[in-house]
Amino acid sequence: MNYKFDIPAQTKSIIKVIGVGGGGSNAVKHMHKQGIKDVEFIICNTDKQALESSTVPNKLQIGADLTEGLGAGAKPERGRQAALESKEDIRNLLNQGTKMLFITAGMGGGTGTGAAPVIAQVAQELGILTVGIVTAPFVFEGKRKREQAEQGIRELSEHCD
């Protein structure tokens, strides 16, 4: 007897890990250096210089027009607007056979706090199983940063499984 198996030829992994902002990008850079296979690692940032200096091969710059390649200045609304500006790029990136997405970000700053919920929303719209893994600021980093982080975590959790 002969058996024939039709195995789909995939060029992209079905599991993606995206690091959003500086903190998330640092986490993904560390994971990428560990040599984990069958996972696609991506860094996403408003800061063009930070993207260019990273060793992670898959990069997505968001909000290039809004931020002119600079960071979000610790302003989550600016990070959110940057992600909305690049929503179709995010959708195209995720719409390449992705079945599961891990979003990692440091909450309390601008890009991670503001953009991670938008990325999760796009993933949710595409029916992708989405997990958020974030860090919160230390108490000594201040009340404002802590409040921004808590708001960002609430928004992110609305779009995560």
Where are these regions (language model features)?
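Tubulin/FtsZ superfamily GTPase core signature
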Residues: M1-D161
